[in-house]
């Protein structure tokens, strides 16, 4: 039988530590694996890597791992990460089994821990006789997983959610939504909600169909290994977000079935359609007994569905054991099964409703646009998908629901937390000039803003944070209206993002604002008035367990009449500032100065493209729309931006284009003529007569002007167009000037409007095209021109000549201090390779001149005797067109200038 092989080329880039003391991991390189041996044949992520694991050596590393909550330091274990490194973790054993079950199956274990180098990264991993699975929740960089890659667990794949390639899978959550009687998102219940220093455990009866057991080898131990792997990830999320842990009950083996002909469950299609709800409840009631578990769940192996049976029904006899989860791809393991499906259905059982808003359910927690992206959303399953998979966390609306529900239950065992304190939110002060925290702000419409949190943790834990919308959508904000929009009057207008190490969130994403985009499909400022509410959640990621959260809220009111607040100066490419010069900054106030905290503004400067703003150009200056500033003595930069923000409010504005400091802009305009003979046009044709002009010199277009000399008795018959190198057609003359004969005209978008005359002579702006749209692209290459006479008749036309003027801009450092080089000059610049350097030397030493290209390669090196007055002409005979650095040295004096060779 011929086997189909999947070729996998994997680069070896890991640290030498792999070959040293912790060599139980081995990265695979240039490996061929039969496709039929793989759990799945599609790639997991762009950054995926394959490994083998010496399981025996790995088990030795786990020999003396302390128990979680023991108070002992964690054991050291190493795992590969998506950065190509072997990462050190401190880990504790954190069993998912009740003690009797754990004693019966000592080879099936679960662990939790924290990274030694990335203090906010937490790990969960499981091990059983077949192998391991891991989950590292890493803020700002996605979640990382290690899972079996081959069916025999001999090869593992490391992948991350940031570059995940997971395809959409069909899945339906059939849970019927119901609204719990507990408060939902009212402000009183929301304020400063924490995990209440209580660690809860619940007893989980986890049954499975026989096909699930078959997938894991056909034995009870194999099925328990699969359950343990899934619950390791599930409990990792529940503990971090809810301080809750589910333990599989001691006699769970009694509801693990190995024979599909005799198990009490329907087949996958029927069961996932809803039959399993009652079948599971009946099984748990009769086999386990209602007094012996708190929450029941069934794992299927096919069918593609989930149904919790009820919302918040844990601890309720006759209902608490009616939930199931089953995959659509026949693979009941892995991140999609564990995070997207199992935690979702268990979240329903614990009291959480759906958080998406593509449909509304009256639950009061439809707080995510579209499909949503958190656990209780429907990522990848709707027509309005934020993304294809769920992120591994609960949105706060669901955290609050579940906490509220569990506080009404008596079955969870609550243990007071004594080794970890709740993080303290000192909600942000609007500025250092005020003494009271603000929980509401009014901002201008169509203006971005920043939500800021201030948190202290008594234990010094590595904190992570989320800012999330808590505006639940109604029917008018569902379906196509569930996406973000500037005119959205209610419901969520900002998607949720996973926990971050920054307590601040830019609304919308800062990268979008830098690009001038204030509205995207999943984030948008409002152009109309409305109130928006947001929850700020702090997670403490406490090492060794007992994690705690705390939350508070803020209201942002968008004014219907004030704004937008926007910077209007520094809005064109190529603006250059000299250090020490005076510049004017302007902005549209639009009555923003009437808002609280907005009478004055701060104006800040960035020289790294807007990543940081370390320079304050004006502090606490009136918010009047105009300010003259002195440019500070910053390092030279080609990527400067401005931020203007009120002194005591949360909105801000960024200027629209990068500008320069310490550089000058050199504009070089060259006219290129068509060198061919005049040519006649064919009457009444839809076909272009095309000609080409080559521009040999590299450069970025800043302006284009086109001149045409044509003979025709009626210019209205003519069409003319241009295509830049690599571009699309742009028609700059389109049947204008009825009855006008002949032209010698230049088309310049900065020119006056077209004024028809006979002949048509002068400079005009094209009436139906904007040549400015060519700016910013490369000028080098073939420019195509098209001409046609679209009217059939006796009058024919001739293009006598045409040309294109292309202007490009280059930058060069402003002239440095020319001390020691009196009367210095370098000319011409730009030049054709020949230029003159002249100055009066202040030193008697020899004069040296070197020319380098921008890669550092030396092009020319000459030495000259010093005669006092120096004037030499230099030639760059074989140098290509481009920018070069000319260095002139006279003793201890040196100057460097840029030249442009055309």
Language-model features: where?
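Loop and turn regions of beta-sandwich accessory domains that flank beta-strands and are enriched
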Residues: 622, 633-638, 649-815, 830
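Fold-level signature of zinc-dependent metallopeptidase catalytic domains
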Residues: 22-29, 34-37, 155-309
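C-terminal outer-membrane/trafficking sorting elements
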Residues: 2-10, 15-19, 817-827, 831-902
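Residue-level detector of functionally pivotal "anchor" positions at catalytic/ligand-binding pockets or at interdomain
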Residues: 413-418, 663-672, 806-827, 840-842, ...
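N-terminal prosegments of processed precursors
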Residues: 20-146, 276
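Exoplasmic/lumenal beta-rich domain surfaces
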Residues: 247, 466-528, 602-627, 727-775
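Extracellular acidic, Ser/Thr/Pro-rich low-complexity tracts
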Residues: 443, 454-459, 540, 588-594, ...
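The catalytic-center signature of Zn2+-dependent metalloproteases
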Residues: 249-275, 315-392, 468, 473-483
